[in-house]
Amino acid sequence: MSTAAPAASATNSAIPAQKEFSLPPSTDTVSVPVNRKKQKRRQKQAARLAAERQSNGHISPDAATQNGSSPAADPEGYHSDEFGDVDQEQLSNGDANHKDDQDSVDAHDDYQYPGNGSEGLQKPTGRKSKKKKGKKGPNGTHAPEDETATHASTPSVSMSHPLPPTLPSHLGPRPILKPAKTRSIWNTSTQEERENIKTFWLELGEEERRQLVKVEKDAVLKKMKEQQRHSCSCTVCGRKRTAIEEELEVLYDAYYEELEQYANHNQGSFEKGPPIVPPPRLYQPPLRSPGQHTRTQGQFHPSRGRIHEVPEEEDDDDLEEDYDEDEEDDEPYSDEDSDDEDDEARAARADFFAFGNSLTVKDGILTVADDLLKNDGKHFIDMMEQLAERRMQREEDTQYGIAAAHQSLHSGHNHGPFDEEDYDEEEDEDYDSQEDEDYEEDEMDTMTEEQRMEEGRRMFQIFAARMFEQRVLTAYREKVAEQRQQKLIEELLEEETRNEQRNAKKAREAQKRKDKKKLQKQAKEEERARREAEKAAEEAAAKAEQEKKLEEQRKKREEQRKKKEADRKAQEEERARKEAEKLRRQREERERQAEVERKQREEKKRREEARRKEKEERELREKKAKEEQLQKDAAKAEEAAKEREKREYQAKRTSPFSSNQHPQISSSPVAHSPHIQSGIPVVPKAPTPARPRQPSQQDSHTSSPHSQPASTDPSQASVSPRSMPISQSSGASSVASKHVHGLHAMFHQPQPSAPLSPLGRSIPPGFSAMNGLPPGPPGLTGILGRPPMAHELPVYPPHSGPFIGQFRGYPTPNGIPAAPGINGARAMPPGRGFPLESAHGFPFHGQQQIPGAFSAQQSGLPHGHSRQPSGSFERSPLEGQTQPMPISRPSPIKRPSSTQQDQRKNGDRTAQRDVDDLSAHLGSSALLDDTDVPFASTLSQSLPGATAPGPLPGPARASFGGPSLFPDPLSTSGWSNNAFGSGVHHRAHTSRPVAIRLLVIQACKQLNTMSPFKGADGFHDVSLVLRQVEQLRPQNEPSISLKEMLDICDTEGSTQNGGGSFSTKKDETGEFVKFEPDNNSAASGHRGSIVPGEIGSPVPSSSLPAFGGIGTPSVLRQFSSPPMGF
């Protein structure tokens, strides 16, 4: 069976009603066999209703049968019962368990219809009459309002009968809805919901009602077939269900054809059966009184509980129950609705078995006759209530039948037990089969085709009524939902309006507060402006007072400045006067010096002339004396050699350490000529005792050459060995005298001025020969043995222990002085495998004697002043060290004073020159002018406790054993071999920036000296200066970058970093730098002002620094610290 009904019609089936037709037309005519039980029950019910109608004054059953009028039902009762209960079930608990047929039977016994204000009358007594409850009310007639309810569908309608009386006023329709202001759509009670449903139906128009009760054919058939989904699917049940569906289709099609014929011809009948309208007897019982409570179910049941039912009716029960289960969630329609009702019975309920007459089919749509929809639809509502009662009565009959057949329910089937409230096709089949067995003899052919068609029509009528009921309820609830939605929207709009009003109020209040704050702020601004104006006035007054004070102070400062300016001008004038006086003195001094030099030159010419004459005479005398002296000297030499060998032999046997303290011979630091002079014979004289020197001659700063007449005595002048003749033709006498003088001078303490000849000098007693070698040949006692060669070991190995260096006396190897009496021989630097060279063909090796062995002044100690000590002895040519002295103005070139006559002649000049030297070297700072800047002190003056230099030099190339101009590069000695002082060892403690600045200053000075032309402005290329600085930089120092040098040039000069300032300039050729000295620069000192290459500058030192590297430059020595050891 196909279903093609619209969805709206399928879902809006909402009309509760049931209708069943009874086939027997009357008790008189029994044409076909029927179900006797149902027939008896229906007959009894019809008789009861007819009696009730007659007792209440209604029309007779015959009249009712003739006209077939449909009495009106109470619309309140319908809504109070069916719709109200359904809605209560949905809204309150949602319980849709409407399958309990037994409960439905019990509940139906005491079912009452409240809401009409009448008491229900008790039903006739029956099996369950004791459960009935009812209320008695006033009696009254209940006449149908519309007697034409079945005019169009009943063929035996008589239009001549009068209309039944109208309903009383208390039974008429009354408004149930409360006023809109008092009622609520959100929370409604059950009674209010029932009233609202009833009012909703009454408010609908005729067209709207017609649209609600329209049901499509396919929708009804679809609903019927859907009831079979939950039944058993076994073979037996499947076959049974298939047969039932086929029969349902046949019945449905036949029913629809009959309805269509009836709609077209206003009447119709089956070809072989009774007409579609039920027999008139069903309409004979009059309507009950309003207060009567009718029991619609049959009062009698078979003694064994077996009821013979046709399969269609049983299948209708199952379909009806299943349909209720499907609609359980959405639109529950339960038989238990009657269980929840109170005892108030509904009055005036008609027996609407003529519902089938009102069903029509138009264009395939099942609908209700128009007369049921007119007159506010009251007839339709009453008819639906009556159909519902018929449905419950039929369910009760089915319940008893199933209970009787329950014993053999599962005899040939494997199904589980079924609940009392659930029945399917198998139960009906078993029930039917058992009924067939029980009534096999007399009821085998009770069901005819007409009966089956009648039952089918009744089943379809029930379905249609229920679908109508559902549609009405659904439409009501849609309306309620729409009302609630609209109410919600209105409430939301009201809430939004209230919020907007509240926000507007808040905005107004905020604006008021803002305006108030603005006024307060404006008042505060005015107050602040007033205070600021007062404060500005006070500040202006204070400022005026302050300006007045500042003006006074400015005037005072101006006066002070003018006063200071006048004082400065006076000082400048005084300084200019002193400068002019100074220049005048200097000019006079230069004139006087020029006069003295002129006189000296004249004196020199006279002295040279006299010396030449004296020389000629002396040569003649010496020539004669030499021959005699040679013979004597040879004999004395042999004699002396034997005695010396004897003494040496004895000295070797005794201890070499002698406790005798040898007198030290002081040497004079008078400069000598570096050139080899021709030998001039000196007449030997007896040594005269010399006056001992006073300590003031060395330590006093205020002494002058005039206070030392002995220093200029010609008898105390030392004889330089370079001025002596080397030839052996001078005679033995002179040699012998020299030897005697040498020995006598060594041990004669009061006569330190006796010269020691380097040729006749012998080893003192108690001292062994140098390096353990025997002394030289006779006549050459002063010549030491050869130095050790490369394969020989020196007397003291290099780097010997420093413990003996604490004693005074002869220095040991590496410059450490040893105790008196210890052999002072010094070892030669190891690894030197070649002999020393001599200068100018002299057959003497360069082994140096011990310098200053008998010196009166300990070398290395600082002098009291930088002036040259006045001594009568010249320094020995064999000494490797000269006394450190400051470099002064170079003296005029003159002949060396090698003879006593020259010294005697030049005595006055020497005294005058000493005065000049004193003025250049000495003098107190108090005698200087205010503008004079005192000389920077030298190292020996500024650093107290300066010690002696390092070790004595080793063998070096020299002429006549003297120091050479350029020392041996292999020498590790710290003693300088030049004639301009020694390279003093001082560990540099200056910082790197200061050292770099000093190197840059020295490089600039050297570049100034080496300038190729006179017109140089003093600017030098920075790359050239950097190259020169790199040459001067010690090797153990890191390299200097150009940027670092330029950064150092930007520093300000001071006494620590060399003073002066640097000027830089840039052009297209490059960048140039220039050094400009000032009073703090090294140029103001007498030692630091000498740049290598200038006149009087010393030869660069070859000594090594204390901790390695190349010798420290002379400029850096001024700012170095004393050594930390020795």
Swiss-Prot record:
Biased composition (Basic and acidic residues): 96-111, 492-512, 522-651, 902-914
Gene Ontology cellular component terms for the protein in this record: cytoplasm
Bias kind Basic residues: ranges: 35-45, 125-136
Subcellular location: Cytoplasm
Job of this protein: May act as a negative regulator of salt tolerance.
Residue runs in coiled coils: 479-655
Predominant location: cytoplasm
Transmembrane segments: none
Biased composition (Polar residues): 291-300, 655-670, 694-721, 846-860, 867-885, 1115-1126
Keywords noted in UniProt: Coiled coil, Cytoplasm, Stress response
Listed Low complexity bias regions: 1-17, 727-737, 886-898
Residue span of region Disordered: 1-192, 266-348, 404-453, 492-774, 823-914, 939-965, 1075-1126
Family the UniProt entry places it in: Belongs to the NST1 family.
Pfam families xrefs: NST1
PANTHER family named in the record: LD36051P, STRESS RESPONSE PROTEIN NST1-RELATED
Start-end of Acidic residues biased regions: 311-344, 419-448
Protein name: Stress response protein nst1
Keyword Oxidoreductase (UniProt): no
